[in-house]
Amino acid sequence: DQAVLDALKKGVEVKAFAAALKNLKAAGIATYVYLLFGTPAESPEAARRTLSFVVAHATEIGFLNLAIFNLPAHGPKMEGIASGTFYTGDLPLYRPFVHPLGWDRKEVRCFLEKEFKKEPAIAAILRRDPPFFTSNHAPFFVMASD
């Protein structure tokens, strides 16, 4: 979603991703798309716009990796984010946080399982992922199917 990318200061435009997917597909290069859900700037509506983008470009996406945002324990402070520790003495990589838009991890996970992954075009992409798969291996699976 463009508003999420802008809020997170990513410096990229969704239309550039669309063009890249199209051009990579035309060149015969497989894509492994990593999507991060539940960032502080994302709402359920924004996530649904991401779902629509993936559906619109499903024929150009080789593989998908879906992840849920974790707030880094020692990353930059994010304004308006209430965070804490998991327990006294904990040495975590991540901090628990209260999503500023009320979209907590449980709701994000529910959206992914009950809505995002249920979309037929997306489910077809997810079924292509081998059980032990990383983005480093994507080209080999595409080459094997040629």
Question: What are these language model-derived features?
Answer:
Residues 1-146:
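A structural motif corresponding to the C-terminal lobe/cap of the Radical SAM core domain
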